[in-house]
Amino acid sequence: MSLQTLQTELKAKLRQYQDFPSKGIVFEDILPIFQDPKSFQQLIDAFKLHIKDTFGDKKIDVIVGLDARGFLFGPTLALAIGAAFVPVRKQGKLPGKTVHAEFQKEYGKDVFEIQEDAIKPGQTVIVVDDIIATGGSAACAGDLVTKLKGEVLEFIFILELLFLKGRDKLCAPAYTLLSGQE
């Protein structure tokens, strides 16, 4: 199946909720993709096609998934391409020694962490999450990978809220599978 066909079928699965979680917000619900095994497989297939088209035979060592929705598909994608999966979590959720970085949220700051031995110097990394909005959390994850001397090749998202220009904050190119709100 072509990437374009996969995108069309996956886009049809999305639901929108007006005024959620607050008035004036249109919430893009990706969960129906994960509730249907065929759609979930199509999501992984679409990302695999993109990675193959973009990087050819270049080895991707690590998929980094952001807390929490990057955990929905990050491990499955990592397994599908023969890469390791490494979680980036909110502060205090990972055991052992960690490296941390702050990022700005709508109403204050938050902190992400990664285990300090999770990525080896020189490893190639793709960072994944469900949606890129302001780009703060994704940029923070990229900073953590860089602190561990990994090479961020790309950021991959299911959706993007283009009007927030989050990709401008990222340290590597961004790929969005489905078009989101303009």
Swiss-Prot record:
GO terms for cellular component: cytoplasm; nucleus. It catalyses: AMP + diphosphate = 5-phospho-alpha-D-ribose 1-diphosphate + adenine. It is an enzyme of class 2 (transferase). It is found in: Cytoplasm; Nucleus. The keyword Transferase applies. GO terms for biological process: adenine salvage; AMP salvage; purine ribonucleoside salvage. Its cofactor is Mg(2+). AMP binds at A133, T134, G135, G136, S137. Catalyzes a salvage reaction resulting in the formation of AMP, that is energically less costly than de novo synthesis. Homodimer. This is Adenine phosphoribosyltransferase. The gene is APT1.
